[in-house]
């Protein structure tokens, strides 16, 4: 993959560069950024609530949230579409509750890029949840006690103490999410969204152009490396250490 850019480009790559390549890169970037944001939101918040709060069913949710791994993103895609489509599952439920009516115009439609983003987010946030929850579990209780002694509210403790301490775990989870997201083909194909993965698939299997497929894969690696560089630059020289004493 890394040496493919030194090879002579094919006619198909030239055609792709003049037509759809920018579109592929743009779609992949939008989906990646949106999925990273949602998985960060779902994963960190769910890990925080099950780690620091005691509510009915908390022990159940500690393990149930891991089950997002069990369902591939394209299965979420099919289920999401079937539930919200015209005369779909949600329509049947509303009709059963309130009788016949034109409810389709009130039911939101999750298709295209929005559907792909939601499906991948529901499937992949488990990476962030598992690693962040493990980090929260091993955080020293002294940090929390110090924040309380300093008069921090729960919100201030979360943003100033808990979240920064869990940064390495969160970044590791988001890195896995990014690689899974960019390599996904089934979900984006289901929603008819063209990404770099679509270009790789078409280049290799439809046009038998392995070199172009490798060159497109190189773009994916560049995006991942750029994310690592940005994270490392924003972290500066900060180092993170965790006590083995958890809650």
Question: How should these model regions be labeled?
Answer:
Residues 150-152, 164:
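Glycine/proline-centered hinge or cleavage motifs at structural transition points of membrane proteins
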Residues 18, 54-57, 137-142, 152-155, ...:
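Juxtamembrane helix-boundary/capping and inter-helix hinge elements in multi-pass membrane proteins
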Residues 12, 18-19, 185-222:
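Interhelical loop and adjacent transmembrane-helix boundary motif
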Residues 11-14, 62, 92-99, 141-149, ...:
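Short amphipathic alpha-helical coupling elements at transmembrane boundaries
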Residues 1-7, 19-136, 165-185, 213-233:
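Membrane-water interface segments at the C-terminal ends of transmembrane alpha-helices
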Residues 230-247:
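Alpha-helical transmembrane segments of integral membrane proteins
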